[in-house]
């Protein structure tokens, strides 16, 4: 009777180390299943009692199982090699993942910084745009103000020129009408009329003395003077002489009074003309100083506005500077 074979439980070296991957686990499960099937078959044959006739079959089956196990071990080794390779690739991929994640974090941080920088740039651009708009509005306001000041200065210059022409024409007319020669002629005429009146007064006085002498001659001796005076005073000659004397005296007084009044009027008119001339001269100087002060203040305002304005106010300032010589002339 043949000896009972022992259960085959031999495992190849390194099989425990190879059973770490999914393919090694599948190969181990397959070989173990085959061994268990063989052991069950041996036990069945032992129970039946027909183990010897089929020993060769068992040996062949064992050889097949060993070859299958060897093949499974080779496949398991290849699978382990593939597993190691895949594990290395997984490790490298994990490292690559960590590296890419680090790069992604850095890129995200850079992106966040760039977004903040872009927001700052946009806010700066908006601020500059608002400042530019304010500068444009300020420049347009200053240009309008400069135009208004130029128009105001032009109107002032025209008014000053018109007033100056009026004053000059008035002064010219006054000077032409009241020249010193003309005043001298009028004074000489008045003096001559005064001398003539004085001569007439002397003649009238001489006539009065002559009349008095005649009256004295007509009176005669002193004893009969009262009677003779009464007769002479009641005569027509005395009445005519007295009337003539009164008329001549009245006429001389009127002429003298008219001459004195005319002389006084001429002197008063001469003083008025001198005062008017002095007043016109002072007014002319005053208006000239005011216009010059206004021009200087306008120039200062234009200079200050030119310093804060754009090239457009610079052109307006140049135009104003070009107009100044014509206004001064």
Swiss-Prot record:
Q: What does this protein do?
A: Major component of the transverse central element of synaptonemal complexes (SCS), formed between homologous chromosomes during meiotic prophase. Requires SYCP1 in order to be incorporated into the central element. May have a role in the synaptonemal complex assembly, stabilization and recombination.
The record's subcellular location field reads: Nucleus; Chromosome
Q: Which InterPro entries match?
A: SYCE1
* Gene from which this protein is expressed: Syce1
Q: Which family does the similarity line name? A: Belongs to the SYCE family.
Q: Which domain of life is it from?
A: Eukaryota
- Keywords for this protein: Cell cycle, Cell division, Chromosome, Coiled coil, Meiosis, Nucleus
> Which protein is depicted?
Synaptonemal complex central element protein 1
Q: Where is region (Disordered) located? A: 1-33, 295-329
Q: What interactions and quaternary structure are annotated?
A: Homodimer. Found in a complex with SYCP1 and SYCE2. Interacts with SYCP1, SYCE2 and SYCE3. Interacts with SIX6OS1.
Q: What main location does UniProt list?
A: nucleus
Q: Which parts of the chain are coiled coil?
A: 28-168, 194-294
Name the residue ranges with Basic and acidic residues bias: 314-329
- Keyword set includes Cell division: yes
GO annotation terms (biological process): cell division; synaptonemal complex assembly
List the record's Gene Ontology CC terms alphabetically: central element; chromosome; synaptonemal complex
Native organism is Rattus norvegicus
């Amino acid at each position: 009777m043949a000896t009972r074979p022992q259960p085959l439980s031999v495992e190849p070296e390194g099989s425990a180390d190879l059973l770490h991957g999914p393919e090694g686990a599948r190969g181990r499960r397959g070989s173990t299943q085959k061994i268990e099937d063989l052991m069950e078959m041996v036990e069945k044959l032992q129970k039946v009692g027909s183990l010897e006739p089929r020993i060769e079959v068992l040996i062949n089956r064992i050889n097949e199982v060993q070859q299958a196990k060897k093949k499974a071990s080779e496949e398991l080794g290849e699978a382990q090699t593939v597993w190691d390779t895949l594990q290395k690739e997984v490790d490298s991929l994990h490292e690559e993942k960590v590296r890419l994640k680090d790069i992604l974090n850095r890129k995200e941080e850079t992106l966040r910084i760039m977004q903040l920088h872009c927001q700052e740039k946009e806010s700066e651009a908006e601020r500059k745009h608002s400042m530019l708009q304010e500068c444009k509005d300020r420049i347009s306001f200053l240009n309008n103000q400069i135009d208004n000041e130029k128009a105001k200065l032009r109107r002032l210059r025209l008014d000053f020129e018109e007033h100056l022409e009026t004053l000059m024409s008035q002064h010219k007319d006054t000077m032409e009408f009241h020249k010193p020669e003309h005043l001298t002629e009028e004074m000489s005429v008045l003096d001559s009329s005064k001398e003539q009146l004085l001569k007439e007064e002397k003649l009238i006085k001489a006539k009065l003395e002559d009349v008095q002498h005649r009256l004295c001659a007509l009176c005669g001796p002193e004893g009969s003077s009262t009677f003779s005076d009464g007769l002479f005073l009641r005569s027509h000659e005395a009445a005519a002489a007295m009337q003539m004397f009164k008329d001549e005296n009245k006429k001389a007084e009127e002429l003298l009074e008219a001459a004195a009044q005319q002389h006084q009027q001429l002197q008063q008119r001469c003083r008025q003309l001198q005062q008017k001339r002095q007043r016109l001269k002072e007014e002319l100087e005053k208006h000239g100083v005011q216009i010059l002060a206004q021009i200087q203040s306008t120039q200062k305002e234009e200079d200050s506005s030119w310093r804060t304005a754009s090239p457009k106010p610079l052109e307006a300032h140049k135009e104003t500077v070009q107009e100044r010589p014509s206004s001064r002339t």
